[in-house]
Structures are given as C-alpha cells and as structure tokens.
C-alpha cells in the first residue's frame, strides 16, 4: 500500500513494569542509507544458500584461518551463481579476544575465565555436537576420524557440530587435548589470547589472506580487555 505508519496511532511506549520503565521510542538516528543491511547468522548449507542469495554479510564461527577462507570463498562463489557479485556478501566471524598488556597475563585471564568449566560439561558438549561418548576413554587416547559416529540428527548448532567434527578429522587429538579446545570449553569462534599488538597482527594476517571482511568482537574475561580493544586494537586497525 506504500503506507508505513498511521501518524495518528504513533505514541510513546510509556511502559512501566516490574523490571524496567521506558518512555520510548528508541532515541537513535535513522539509518543513513535507503536499505538496512541484512546479516545472516550461521554457516550451515542452508544458511550459506540463504546468505549468498540475499544477505549483505554473514556472521559465523570460524575457529581457524583455513575455515574462514573456505567459508568466504564458498559464499562468494554461491553469490555469483545467484547472479550477484562476490563482493556483495561479506564474512564477519565472531572473534573472542582475551587481551592484556603481556601474553602471560592474557593466558592467565583466559585460564581463569574458563576454570569453572568442568570435565563433565566438556564431555557433554562433545557428545551433543558429535554423538561421541568419551566418558570412559583414557586421557591419552587419540580421537580419530574413524571413531566419529554419523552426525546427530538434531544439534544446538549445526555449524558448531561441523567445525568440531572437522577439527577431529584433521588433528586427531588426544582426549585430554580435545576437552581443552576452545570449541569445547567455550565456542567455535576465532580465539585470540595475547596483547593488543598481537591481536592486531592476527586480524591483519587473516584479512590479507582473504579469510575475512571484518569481524564481530567478543572481548572476554575483564573490562580491561574491552578497554584494550577500544583504545588500542581498533585505532591500530585504522592506521
């Protein structure tokens, strides 16, 4: 109909409830372009098809540079097959950042943040994501590709499941090493633990390799990590 809203019906929210009060509406300026960017979350086959057909960007888990580069190349190819340009779709992976003035402090921050993750929880994550029950396996036993059962029919994150299975197929880690992997104790997102300068170098390296177009930052462990991201990493990336 071309009618966006009936001005006579637009009024302040003026909500007052048990948990919060808000006058409304949102006090942010309108987006400066004619069309709001569309972002797809997730990199399953269906998600890639959808993103390559309509999205401006995709947010996905890419725990290593090779996975990110493969995803970006695949999305650009799919976009071109659908009559779009490769540059029409951008890859913005999640980036978990544990930042501190020294590498040792950053590693300590990461360890402290994840210290409460129990072995039972890690075992449950592996079982849920891969269908593999490691409860009775010796710590030093290797987990091989041939040990993996067929993928579970239902998983919380199909992308996470695929990434974890791919890592096992590639690295064949020992049980104790698998249970310490970021994909198991945290998430399958790209992880950087170190100084701001190290983070900048890693980001620039991934960008130069054609693995990313940007990233969605998750500074973790402390407010100092947020400060270091905003005050040192972001300005350095703009140089």
Feature roles, as predicted:
Residues 1-32, 66-70, 77-207, 238-239:
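An alpha-helical appendage that flanks or caps ligand/catalytic pockets
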Residues 38, 51, 106, 206, ...:
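Conserved, mostly hydrophobic/aromatic
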Residues 38-41, 57-60, 89-95, 215-217:
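Hydrophobic faces of well-ordered beta-strands that scaffold small-molecule active sites
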């Amino acid at each position: 109909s071309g009618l966006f809203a009936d001005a006579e019906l637009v009024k302040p929210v003026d909500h007052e409830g048990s948990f919060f009060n808000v006058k409304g509406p949102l006090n942010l300026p309108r987006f400066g372009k004619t069309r709001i960017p569309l972002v797809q979350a997730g990199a399953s086959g269906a998600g890639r098809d959808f993103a390559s057909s309509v999205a401006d960007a995709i947010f996905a888990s890419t725990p290593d540079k090779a996975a990110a580069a493969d995803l970006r190349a695949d999305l650009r190819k799919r976009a071109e097959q659908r009559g779009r340009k490769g540059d029409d779709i951008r890859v913005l992976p999640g980036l978990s950042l544990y930042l501190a003035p020294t590498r040792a402090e950053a590693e300590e921050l990461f360890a402290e943040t994840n210290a409460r993750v129990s072995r039972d929880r890690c075992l449950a994550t592996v079982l849920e994501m891969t269908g593999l029950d490691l409860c009775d396996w010796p710590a030093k036993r290797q987990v091989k590709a041939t040990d993996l059962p067929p993928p579970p029919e239902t998983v919380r994150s199909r992308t996470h499941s695929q990434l974890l299975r791919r890592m096992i197929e590639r690295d064949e880690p020992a049980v104790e090493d698998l249970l310490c992997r970021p994909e198991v104790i945290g998430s399958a997102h790209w992880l950087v633990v170190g100084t701001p300068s190290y983070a900048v170098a890693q980001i620039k390296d991934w960008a130069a390799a054609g693995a990313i177009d940007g990233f969605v930052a998750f500074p973790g462990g402390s407010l100092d990590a947020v400060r270091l991201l905003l005050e040192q990493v972001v300005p350095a990336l703009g140089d």
